[in-house]
Amino acid sequence: MVRVRFAPSPTGALHIGGVRTALFNYLFAKKHGGDFLLRIEDTDQNRYVEGAEQYIINSLNWLGLTYDEGVGKEGKYAPYRQSERKPLYKQYADTLINNGWAYYAFDTAEALEKARQECEEKGDTFIYNWATRNTLENSLSLTFEEVQQRLTRGDAYVVRFKMPEKEILKMSDMIRGEVTIDTSTLDDKVLFKSDGMPTYHLANIVDDHLMEITHVIRGEEWLPSMPLHILLYRAFGWQAPAFAHLPLILKPVGNGKLSKRDGIKLGFPVFPMDWTENGETLKGFSGEGYFPEALINFLALLGWNPGNDEEIFSMDELIQLFDLEKVHKAGARFDPEKIKWFNHQYLQKKSDAELAVAFQKELIAKDIEVASTKVEKIVSLIKERATFVADFWELSKFFFEAPKKYDEKAVKKQWKENTPTIVREVIEVLQNTLDFNSVALEEAVKNYMETKQLGFGQVMPPLRLALVGELKGPHVFDIIELIGKEETLRRLETILSFIK
């Protein structure tokens, strides 16, 4: 059975790259009828940020990425916070020491800094590995008695992995194919820290094994760690999961990985939900009015393509189509305009009733009381030009309040010498129209235009100016029907008194 995990660290807001990693894990699990786990990797207590864990959970919930096991959904592999699994890791570190795959290292920070400086003076780069480990203070260079004495008196130590010397390691990645590396170029990574906590590397491998993870799908930034992780599985005598390293999400312009600073600089969110740090709230996609399904659709196509020209996919369709082998190796450029396009598409797909409920909240905040049926009709007329629900007010405020000014360029272009006469005659036509609906109103005005031999441009633009204040908006007669006879006539009289 397929089992995958999303394993973020609670060191701040969940970045959009992390969201995509969670999404691809979720899609892969559901495609294969498997389980999607959430594990919180909080081994680095110095970087722990209060509230970050709950933020991660809230973000996944908002996006509809429901996990089968994890924090708050305890399964048989609980607990799912690494800080709560602390006693577990020491025994596995000891196992590696006992079977010769790891060793105690007692080097102080000062001693390591001195070794680095000496290497740099020779023009070399210091690496703690097969070439240098026997010259440093560790259980490989010290006698057994010296090591026991140091451990007994409580000397600070870390546990390092004993990287094999001069081995050409061949690994398989589901996205990148075969990856080869010479272990001589790798360092002896710390697996267990002096504070009694494991590093990411040890905890990650132990937990993935114990939780029976079958596929590790993570960001490209973890590709350099793959050799160590493969070798750790070998050292423990365990079957390694399949690995897949996702391409980076790149800046909209320029080189490099998308960062929080890019969002701030260019004015778009990079977090799923609003996040407050140092007293400053950074807007997320949720807070900016994006629909979760629009963000999901957008992220799914960042680095993956189903092999056709379609772009709009429901979650069920994404699950059905998703294939890790179709994920690209190259980085995917983040396009803030494209996600707006997706949001526009999903806004059009929503019912007028659903959008009206959201819009009515804004109207209530403005102390505007309108029947829900009327709000629905207004939404149906304006949503085609909207990207966000927040756009509705600017697109529709003339339904709720008369224009306070008129577009000067439009007035100059459309308000002719005979326009006041035409407007007065239209007022009379509207006053005499008994059936005050869009169809009847349009027919009455068209009959008037034919009788007077007037063109569209002589009548409709001035009429729109009077009602809206500018030459934009929905069908004029739909506007007239919704604002009503009394308000329509008032606005026509107002523009006559305003423009002399």
Task: Mark where each language-model region is.
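Glycine- and acidic
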Residues: 5-10, 38-42, 211-216, 277-282, ...
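Structural motif
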Residues: 285-293, 329-335, 369-378, 450-458, ...
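Active-site cores that bind ATP or allylic diphosphates and position pyrophosphate for catalysis
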Residues: 104, 108-262, 269, 281, ...
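Residue-level signal for inorganic ion chemistry
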Residues: 25, 56, 96, 100, ...
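Conserved phosphate-binding loops in nucleotide/dinucleotide-binding enzymes
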Residues: 79-83, 106, 192-193, 211-222, ...
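N-terminal Rossmann-like or analogous alpha/beta NTP/dinucleotide-binding catalytic cores
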Residues: 1-124, 224-235, 294
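Small-residue-rich helix-loop
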Residues: 352-452
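Charged substrate- and nucleic-acid-binding regions of tRNA-handling and nucleotidyl-transfer enzymes
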Residues: 438-499
